């Protein structure tokens, strides 16, 4: 039987579950595989593009908006049993004159195209600016790519999450506005449903460990961080980042999110799929006779 292929996606959970042996305890035969070979991606290439190309994994993550549309297009199945919350923010250099969200009017903000930073930056800034005054740049790479350009002062502002969020804080970069957003999981290929359950049971245990003693686990950020910065990052100062919420991603949330994306024309009209929850999503919730390991 083929291995269950997992993409960690810049968070702590998979690394904690591996180190603690939680996948092994479940009897899961797995391997980790990166979705993105480089973060210096071309203009308008982001999370959705990777789903269109075809992710060589059985389970991976992205923002819930992109997973919503990708699943609606038949590019995989959105897991409806849980979601996660990722701290995020728009950062500027410490010497920048930009101090308030309204100061971002007309300023190019580096985000990933059709990725979490794209949607969440719009969602946050619409409270302050009309849409025509929000200027997003899609040409600066995905997460680590745009972080590096911000640090090198090649871009005036960038949306960051996960380790780069905490590294920017460590370096004294200023968060102008919070852009915390929801993540979701996508199943691709044809994984065994029981393997998927094993995976999420292991992540549930890892989440508890991270909640209890985050300082023991933030070192795992280094495993996906660019080599250039490994001598500079101090993960002891960083927070736990993304948190998995084992509550349903409901039909109402799915439909509201699909409508929100369509209203902002983030995708060309007619290219988002049918937006039917029952076709796009799958529930693999534990049966009542199953128990999470202690």
Map each language-model feature to its residues:
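Secondary-structure end/capping motifs
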Residues: 194-268
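Conserved C-terminal helix/tail region of periplasmic/extracytoplasmic solute-binding proteins
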Residues: 262-294
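Structural motif
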Residues: 112, 137-141
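Pocket-lining segment of extracytoplasmic ligand-binding domains
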Residues: 142-224
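Proline/Glycine/Serine-rich low-complexity intrinsically disordered segments
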Residues: 95-99, 126, 133, 190-197, ...
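Positions that flank functional sites
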Residues: 38, 67, 165, 183, ...
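Short, glycine-/small- and polar/acidic-enriched structural segments
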Residues: 1-131, 156, 175-179
């Amino acid at each position: 039987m083929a291995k269950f292929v997992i993409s960690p996606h810049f968070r702590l959970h998979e690394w904690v579950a591996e180190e603690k042996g939680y996948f092994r305890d479940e009897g899961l035969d797995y391997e980790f595989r990166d979705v993105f070979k480089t973060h210096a991606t071309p203009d308008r290439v982001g999370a959705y593009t990777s789903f269109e190309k075809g992710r060589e994994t059985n389970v991976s993550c992205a923002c819930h908006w992109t997973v919503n549309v990708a699943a609606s297009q038949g590019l995989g199945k959105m897991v409806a049993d849980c979601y996660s919350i990722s701290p995020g923010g728009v950062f500027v250099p410490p010497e920048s004159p930009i101090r308030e969200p309204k100061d971002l009017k007309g300023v190019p903000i580096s985000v990933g195209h059709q990725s979490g930073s794209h949607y969440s930056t719009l969602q946050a800034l619409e409270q302050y600016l009309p849409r025509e005054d929000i200027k997003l740049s899609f040409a600066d790479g995905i997460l680590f790519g745009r972080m590096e350009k911000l640090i090198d002062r090649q871009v005036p502002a960038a949306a960051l999450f996960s380790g780069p969020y905490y590294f920017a804080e460590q370096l004294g970069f200023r968060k102008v506005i919070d852009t915390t957003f929801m993540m979701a999981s996508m199943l691709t290929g044809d994984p065994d449903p029981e393997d998927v359950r094993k995976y999420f049971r292991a992540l549930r245990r890892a989440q508890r460990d991270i909640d209890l003693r985050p300082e023991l686990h933030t070192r795992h950020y280094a495993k996906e961080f660019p080599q250039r910065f490994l001598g500079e990052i101090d993960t002891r100062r960083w927070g736990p980042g993304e948190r998995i919420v084992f509550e349903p991603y409901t039909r109402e949330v799915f439909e509201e999110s699909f409508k929100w994306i369509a209203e902002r024309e983030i995708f060309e009209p007619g290219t988002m799929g049918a937006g039917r929850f029952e076709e796009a999503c799958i529930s693999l919730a534990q049966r009542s006779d199953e128990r999470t390991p202690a």
